[in-house]
Amino acid sequence: MTATGLDRPFDLLLARFITTRPMRILSGLQPSGRLHIGNFFGMMEAALKLQHEGEAYYFIADYHSLTSIHDAKVLRENVRELAIDFLACGLDPEKCVFFRQSDVPEVTELAWILSTVTPMGLLERCHSYKDKVAHGISASHGLFAYPVLMAADILIYDSDVVPVGRDQKQHVEVTRDLAIKMNEAFGEGLLRIPAPRIREETATVPGLDGQKMSKSYNNTIQLFEEEKALKKKIMGIKTDSTAVEDPKPIEGSSILALYKLVASEADYDVMVADHQRGGIGYGDFKKRLLQATWDYFAPMRARRDALIADSAYVDRVLAEGAAKARTIARATLTRVRDAVGLG
């Protein structure tokens, strides 16, 4: 080592890590089709709060989507829809970095390097592979090695925190294992070891039939449903046969559960009281839910219309986000390449 201390990448690495910076938070979003309100209240709302907590990086996981989407037109449309929807719902490019995963190709090279230290048994123990195959997704190497690419997604941005649901905690644990293996093999401190932040489980958002809202059950209300379609769906929510004059059950009411998400606390309390008192039919409650849902998403709907009309803005946001992300990714990949002997 010379007096400059720059002959080994780890000296630069140590200096960089000692430098304080805001907590870096990473969140990946799969472009799997049109979003519904279950997605919004179950995932999007929490994800949007991250941009106020630190240095937030959001990416659209289009590489990952190739394991289940084999139609180029559909994938492009899904990516576009997701970008527009997240921006419409409040993602602020001035407060976060928002980009397409595939616009940062360095992540695939890091994934390959990580794969060389990944034990087969580690991947075989991942429940996500078995779960997805059980749900009809064709078994493939990409699906099997999914956790390695996810680890590369996390590690290439020196992420500190990765918010995940409890069902995805294992993916962050795999990432930590691989980072530790790389550090042990090629130099302590080579890769930052991230920590999972387990999202508090939100209440299950009920679908039109009372089951959990899911595309699999064909019971969803799309996030930006047209007014006529929204009315048809909400007025068609399944209810019991309680007579108009009788009190309505509170427990298990899909109408009340949905109304609580979109109405003010005061309005929700009024609807609960009206259920308990009786004398009001389900049709009236559904109309209140319809109006509250339409009003709740009105500002987002207006922003979405503006974004659709200004496609150049959306392109610019994604391009600028990718440029920022690649700056970090290139630095990480350079030090990893040097450490393993490729530099």
Where are these regions (language model features)?
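Divalent metal-coordination and catalytic microenvironments
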Residues: 114, 167, 325
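N-terminal Rossmann-like or analogous alpha/beta NTP/dinucleotide-binding catalytic cores
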Residues: 22-152, 305
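Conserved nucleotide- and phosphate/pyrophosphate-binding catalytic cores
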Residues: 20, 170, 176-343
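Short helix-capping/linker segments at secondary-structure and domain boundaries
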Residues: 120-124, 156-163, 263-271, 301
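Internal, conserved structured core segments that host functional sites
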Residues: 137-182, 186
